[in-house]
Amino acid sequence: MVRVIGLMSGTSLDGVDAAGIETDGVAVGAAGPTVTIPFPPELRARTRAILDRAGSLRGDDPELLAVERDLTLLHVAAVRALDWPAELIGFHGQTILHRPAEPRSWQIGDAGLLALETGVPVVHDFRSADLAAGGEGAPLVPVFHQALARGMARPLAVLNIGGVANVSLIGADGALLACDVGPGNALLDDWAMRHTGVPCDRDGALARAGRVDAAVLAGLMGDPFFARPAPKSLDRLAFHRAMDLLAPLSPADGAATLAAFTVRAVASLPLPFQPCRWLVCGGGRHNPVLMDGLRERWGAAGARVEAVGWDGDALEAQCFGFLAARAVRGLPLSFPGTTGAERPVSGGRVEQRGLPVAATRVLARLRQG
């Protein structure tokens, strides 16, 4: 096994997560340290402005390049703060656009700068190969969930509530299925920021003070996304019309309705089998209103991933460390049942230019298995 640092900056724009993991891309060994470097408010605002303009941006846009550099340096700071002797880095980058129908998924981040600043080979560009093979480019975390869940009772579902919510379904026979299921925290975060100046509904306080508007919720659930068969994926801004539907509501009622939207989207997902357990990861598991709504539907079958010893705050970062090792070995990152790709697909590109030979020997070790 090798020591890999995974780096993740999600669409919620709350910070850069860094996590160490020992892995060979097949098995998951010991977990290393973890750290989160919060987005400075100014960088969050600039990144959000890039998200809003991404559909019309060129790759040489000066502000885009400036934001990309500052985001990369924030990732460098996360690696240094971890202070762990990594041999490889998995760098997801910051998604600013995800349109699989085009097909296009755009993650910004300078892998070359990251490699030079840390002295460690960097694996990046995890989604392009899947898109080229007819896949959605997301979600990519299911194969990591499957590796972590080895030996657990099945069938099992792992729900990640990040900016977008996605689910990994592991069948009794080990079959792996997955898809994005609907909004996660992104809409609720945007609503809270607009009405309270705080970038999230902390502890679900705003939603708990409000009432769900049934008519608005029905309108939200009428989005064509929910009629599409899985596998399917979402851009963070996919439900942009939600803000127009919510406009007449009070801040509290809007938050309550958005929380109910996330829960209803999960509950309405057609399942090929009934999981014996639901495990929840991602920032949404910290929202009591979301968790209460999910538990009403799952009962005792639902729990946070901490119940089985996983670190719910580090899971996505750990995943990209795991995927980095798989990518170097040429192992599949996605499958027909997880992204809709026509075949199992590997992916990722390795950035090692300018590094000493000693720093890149890990690549040969991994490729030899």
PLM ranges: what are they?
Residues 15-40, 44, 177-263, 339-365, ...:
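Conserved ATP-utilizing enzyme core subdomain
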